[in-house]
Curated annotation (Swiss-Prot):
Keywords: Ribonucleoprotein, Ribosomal protein. GO terms for biological process: negative regulation of translation; translation. HAMAP family: Ribosomal_uL13. This protein is one of the early assembly proteins of the 50S ribosomal subunit, although it is not seen to bind rRNA by itself. It is important during the early stages of 50S assembly. This is Large ribosomal subunit protein uL13. GO terms for molecular function: mRNA binding; structural constituent of ribosome. One of its GO terms (cellular component) is cytosolic large ribosomal subunit.
Length: 147
């Protein structure tokens, strides 16, 4: 008897909604990455995209442990000499809270040919509203909440 290998059309995708209010960023990213890849399913195969859709709401209310709001930085470079720019995560959370959460989750995903396809299933919103109510997302509870 040969091993069962799921095909791309064999998987049923569920929509999950995660409320990021007072949840530590790293713990949220780990759980969201597991759902996006499909590692929680018994039919998980690393070379097939069998993961589910993930909606993250309240990204502006995410928690960071320690003093990371002021001491952790995001760097970017223009390509010109002296063009290195840095912003603290606290500044980024005020301007673009969805980018901070997206970058944390995408950083937990493998960087291979499937990564772009898996990233398209991630939807992040700063407030409590999202336009995906027609998909009937299931609430996903993260156990650890910031103190």
């Amino acid at each position: 008897m040969s091993t069962y290998t799921p095909k791309a059309g064999d998987t049923t995708r569920t929509w999950y909604v995660i409320d990021a209010t007072d949840v530590v960023l790293g713990r949220l990213a780990v759980e969201a990455a597991k759902l996006l890849r499909g590692k929680h399913k018994p039919t998980f195969t690393p070379n097939v995209d069998g993961g589910d859709f993930v909606i993250v709401i309240n990204a502006d209310k995410i928690a960071l442990s320690g003093d990371k709001l002021n001491k952790k930085f995001a760097y970017r470079h223009s390509g010109y000499p002296g063009g290195l720019r840095k912003r603290s995560i606290g500044e980024l959370l005020q301007k673009h809270p969805t980018r901070v959460v997206e970058n944390a989750i995408v950083g937990m995903l493998p960087h291979n040919k499937l990564s772009r396809q898996v990233q398209k299933k991630l939807k992040v919103y700063a407030g409590p509203e999202h336009p995906h109510s027609a998909q009937q997302p299931v609430p996903f509870e993260i156990k650890q909440v910031a103190q």
